[in-house]
UniProtKB/Swiss-Prot annotation:
Pathway the protein contributes to: Cell wall biogenesis; peptidoglycan biosynthesis
A single cellular component GO annotation: plasma membrane
Pfam families: Glyco_tran_28_C, Glyco_transf_28
Subcellular location(s) of the protein: Cell membrane
Function, as annotated: Cell wall formation. Catalyzes the transfer of a GlcNAc subunit on undecaprenyl-pyrophosphoryl-MurNAc-pentapeptide (lipid intermediate I) to form undecaprenyl-pyrophosphoryl-MurNAc-(pentapeptide)GlcNAc (lipid intermediate II).
Top-level division of the source organism's lineage: Bacteria
Protein name: UDP-N-acetylglucosamine--N-acetylmuramyl-(pentapeptide) pyrophosphoryl-undecaprenol N-acetylglucosamine transferase
Origin organism lineage: Bacteria, Bacillati, Bacillota, Bacilli, Lactobacillales
Bilayer topology annotation: Peripheral membrane protein
GO MF annotation: an example: undecaprenyldiphospho-muramoylpentapeptide beta-N-acetylglucosaminyltransferase activity
Organism: Streptococcus pyogenes serotype M2 (strain MGAS10270)
Known catalytic reactions: Mur2Ac(oyl-L-Ala-gamma-D-Glu-L-Lys-D-Ala-D-Ala)-di-trans,octa-cis-undecaprenyl diphosphate + UDP-N-acetyl-alpha-D-glucosamine = beta-D-GlcNAc-(1->4)-Mur2Ac(oyl-L-Ala-gamma-D-Glu-L-Lys-D-Ala-D-Ala)-di-trans,octa-cis-undecaprenyl diphosphate + UDP + H(+)
Family label: Belongs to the glycosyltransferase 28 family. MurG subfamily.
Main location per the UniProt record: membrane
Entry EC no(s): 2.4.1.227
Length: 360
């Protein structure tokens, strides 16, 4: 019988990306892969879109909140139902291990796997753990982290960032679509790429719309998340969503303006791409992006600008400072030891799964 592994994680693309990097490697080595998630979540969409040979199991999901809300009462029952469903799935499949990338949907499968004696491996991308992974850590065999964590967390293995981006732009596939975009851009202007992510694109979209003079100073690429804004005109390319074009657009840009999500930041670090971070504040997140941005700035990888300070004057000042010290930022990024290849992590995870099985 083939070995089986269960994956879970969802809610945002960032909670699915690493799973989609690892899953093909397990499939290639003959593992039967299953995924537990929300049928209405981004994880289901991304798994279906990938075309990978993965069996998806839907469970009920409820949001975990640190504050009082009447919705908590309903969500308690959803989480309880999700746990019962997860127990049934794990008991039926009898996988060798479960790997979780976090998000609210991941807690019931993690708890179920632990209760049924299955090794549980989780991954934390941010500077500090979110509520879901704080709970999951109590049930985990091992937690891998992108950032160094507190010493008292005995089950932590500090890994660094796992990314599959091409460091060499020449490795990337050519794109006729990109060539068409370049025809609208000026070679005399710097090219800026705005990446807002699923939760933070609106502010960038509005900033660009409110300041048409930006097009006189820069070539602008704006990943909007909104198909109604799609546009290709002089010095401006607005597109709602990209897949194969994502890395080529980063390579094409002289500088990237991004939110503070860990996945994007470390992709930019791996490519040694000059970037300005405008993190989501605590009113829109739990503050993890602020921590990530401060970490990157202190390491000398990037500069940050708080969202309330995102004015045209402050933006121009930040651009001038970044381009003036571009060589220093790029040298610091090129010297980083914080990036790991997918193959390295896959081999480590496989070894840890084998060790956990032998110890049972």
């Amino acid at each position: 019988m083939p070995k089986k592994i269960l994956f879970t994680g969802g809610g945002t693309v960032g909670h699915v990306t690493l799973n989609l990097i690892l899953i093909p490697k397990f499939i290639k080595d003959g593992w039967e892969v299953h995924y537990i998630g929300d049928k209405n979540g981004i994880e289901h969409t991304e798994i279906e879109k990938s075309g990978l040979d993965v069996t998806f199991h839907a469970i009920a999901t409820g949001k975990l909140r640190r504050y009082f809300s009447w919705q908590n009462l309903a969500d308690v029952f959803k989480v309880a139902l999700g746990l019962l469903q997860s127990l049934f799935i794990v008991a039926k499949l009898r996988p060798q291990a479960l790997f979780s990338k976090g998000g609210f949907v991941s807690v019931p499968p993690v708890v179920a796997a632990k209760l049924l004696g299955k090794p549980v491996f989780i991954h934390e991308s941010d500077r500090s753990m979110g509520l879901a992974n704080k709970i999951a850590y109590k049930f985990a065999t091992t937690m891998y982290t992108t950032f160094e964590q507190e010493d008292q967390l005995s089950k932590v293995k500090h890994l660094g960032a796992v990314t599959k981006v091409f460091k060499d732009a020449n490795q990337m596939p050519e794109s006729t679509q990109l060539e068409a975009v370049k025809e609208y851009f000026s070679r005399d202007l710097k090219t800026l790429l705005f990446i807002g992510g699923s939760a933070g694109a609106h502010v960038f979209n509005q900033f660009i719309s409110d300041h048409p003079e930006l097009k006189q100073r820069y070539n602008i690429i704006n990943i909007t998340g909104d198909p109604h804004l799609n546009e290709l005109s002089s010095h401006l390319y607005r597109v709602d969503y990209v897949t194969d074009l994502y890395q080529p657009l980063i390579a094409m840009a002289d500088l990237v303006v991004t939110r503070g999500g860990s996945n994007t930041l470390f992709e930019l670090l791996a490519m040694a791409k000059l970037h300005l971070i405008v993190p989501l504040g605590k009113e829109a997140s739990r503050g993890d992006q602020l921590e990530n941005a401060t970490y990157f700035e202190k390491r000398g990888y990037a500069k940050q600008l708080q969202e309330p300070d995102l004015t045209l004057h402050n933006f121009d000042q930040a651009m001038a400072d970044l381009f003036e010290h571009q060589a220093d930022y790029e040298a610091t990024m090129l010297a980083t030891k914080e990036i790991q290849s997918p193959d390295f992590f896959y081999d480590l995870l496989r070894a840890d799964i084998s060790s956990a099985i032998k110890e049972k």
